[in-house]
Amino acid sequence: MNRLMTFDKYRVFETEFAGRPLKVETGKMTQLANGACLVHYGDTTVHVAVTASEKPREGVDFFPLSVDYEEKMYAVGKIPGSYLKREGRPSEKAILTSRVIDRPIRPLFDKSMRNDVSIVCTVMSVDPDCQPEIVAMIGASIAISISDVPWNGPISGCSVGMIDGEYIINPTEEQRKVSQMATTVASTSSRIAMIEAGANCVSDDDMYNAIMAGHEANQKIISFIEEIKAEIGKPKFEFASLEPDHDMFEAIKAFAEEDVKVALDTDDKRVRDERLKPIYEAVHAKFDEIYPESEALIDECLYKTQKFIVRRWLLDEQKRVDGRGMDDIRPLASEVGVIPRVHGSGMFTRGQTQVLTIATLGPVSDKQLLDGIDGETEKRYIHHYNFPSYSVGETKPSRGPGRREIGHGALAERALVPVIPSVEEFPYALRLVSEVLSSNGSTSPGSICGSTLALMDAGVPIKAPVAGISCGLITEGDRWMTMVDIQGLEDFFGDMDFKVAGTHDGITAIQMDLKISGLTPEMVKEALAKTHKARNYILDEVMLKAIAEPREELSKYAPKMFTTTIPADKISEVIGKSGKVIKEIQAECEVKVDIEEDGELGQVFVSGIDSDKCKRAIEIINTIAVDPEPGAMYLGKVTRIMDFGAFVEIAPGKEGLVHISQLDVKRTENVTDVVNVGDIIRVKVMEIDDKGRLNLSRRQVLIDVDGLVPENDIDAERAARPRRPHNDRRGGYNRNNRK
């Protein structure tokens, strides 16, 4: 007998968030996952599933969490454009969103847990006014909270915009277009768990107030999730901790602590690593027999010993491993013009962290075209970040950019977007590539500084120079302390990496990574103040001394760019049938021509190596787009020679006759004495007859522009001169006085 399925555990929970309905469905879909939910915000719908392995993964010294944010093209009613017609590898935006969701969630898991946990957020429909990234973060928090996976959440997230000084929670699509910032804030019930921001040079106070507005808004959703958890949440499962036991750690710490202190007390990463090698060997020689089959745990104890020492130095003595004060920056160096023939280059060094950035200018058509669930978008400015293994002294094969590289590149890109000139001000596409040459912490802020140097070296008229700096944090109970410009060891053993980029006047980007549950408002405010002071120091004392302002001229190896505007209804004439006309222009002038329609106008971009050829292409295009008028001058190409004159094409499809009498200021016997087929000459439109035929003159150009005098005028001038008397021989040859 057939039976109808019933979903006894199906539940629907509803609330309102920033003036729009938020609905959560559970118990109907994805019943084999540890936890799952379907979240609707407006018409945006995201499905989230959480699964965990039953047993811990062996041989790892970290918590194996993966977060995947998946964009489905059906969510916006599109079929993927690839050959396979299905979604492929995640987009850059999807990877960045996965990282944003991961960052506030990860610290709330027990660090000793080794069970694999997977969180998959699938975007199923998109309402442009309700960002799916925020819905996915909320959905992930709900799914973990109601699952049996141990977690110390919940968290909530929101987007904060600012328009005319007013803070807007989860701004609509139109509001996001005019907002002075795009800030994502995640919170627990008491602390700020994550900040990701891009801003148009806003003040520290504006950014702080936006963060606090987001933190306050998140509290309503956190309470909402707590209610859901209380009603349908599962009991949390027990897991086996793979952390070394207390006695083992204390024994190894007692044996190695003093030697480790000596090893750590240096500002040279290589020296530190060399000092630590014999300590590891000595510890293993003593404890491998005591704790057989526990080599990984012995290494973990040594790692924890280093962490214990560094944190004690910072909290109790305000001592950093390299001897700096808490607000001191490592030695700095800036250099431009490092690499020949490239369009621009800048190298920024901070201690043992060194980043070389190369700037490349290209025609506007080199912009990146993106087609995702946000619709078709364009990126004229692109930043890529590379972190090769040699930068940390390791030998690993290059596998292409990973999530970390994509995330760091996006931060540097976002930091400079507000100062990049508009396409009208600087009609180029821009690509920056930051190569990390050596790394001892804070490479992404270094790539921001290197990018500013490279842009200025390339002659890009940026609105203001941008610098980046990181701020670290050490906490213990109610005690906490911040430090500026953290190096690798302080990043590994500290609680925070708070990266801020900005100009002298304001913030352009923030990225905050935490290893603790969150920050208090006081911690956020202090981090903003310290990074502002530090980036001003970097700009004034180092970067602007290397190059004070963008170069006035572009590199001779950069393409020359010229623009013009034509009526939109003339674009088809410039392109021609099957692109015939525009191809001829590009071939003849050795240039690249790009046209973008903007309402009633067409913006034309011409790029090439030779400025004169670019100008020639612009002139041809303008001639096509504007009907010739009597008195106008054009540069044309001789296409045919006749006995009575030469035909000259001033633009594709626009040809006129230069009569033989109008070829030169002097009498011309043969047309070929003056011009031949293929010659480029400047002509003036003398007349357009009733049939639209053009009568052109080279002779008149020579008179009007070059100031030449026609031959018949010279004859007339000679004829008008008074003649000397026939017998006046002054100054002449006197036959009677011949010698």
What are these regions (language model features)?
Residues N2-A240:
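Long, basic N-terminal domains or extensions that often function
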Residues Y557-P559, T563-K739:
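Single-stranded RNA-binding regions, centering on S1/OB-family and related RNA-binding modules
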Residues A33-S118, V123-S125, C130, E196, ...:
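Glycine-rich, flexible beta-strand/loop modules in the N-terminal catalytic cores of phosphate-handling
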Residues C121, A193-G198, F239-E243, A254-L264, ...:
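Short, hydrophobic beta-strand segments
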Residues G35-C37, C130-D148, V336-A359, N440-V460, ...:
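Conserved phosphate/anionic-ligand binding catalytic regions in large, soluble enzymes, centered on
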Residues D148-L264, L455-E552:
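Mobile "lid/hinge" segments at catalytic clefts and subdomain interfaces of large enzymes
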Residues K111-V117, N152-P154, I221-F239, R270-V271, ...:
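Flexible, glycine/charged-enriched surface loops at secondary-structure junctions
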Residues N2-S53, A240-G375, P559-E573, V581, ...:
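Extended amphipathic alpha-helical scaffolds
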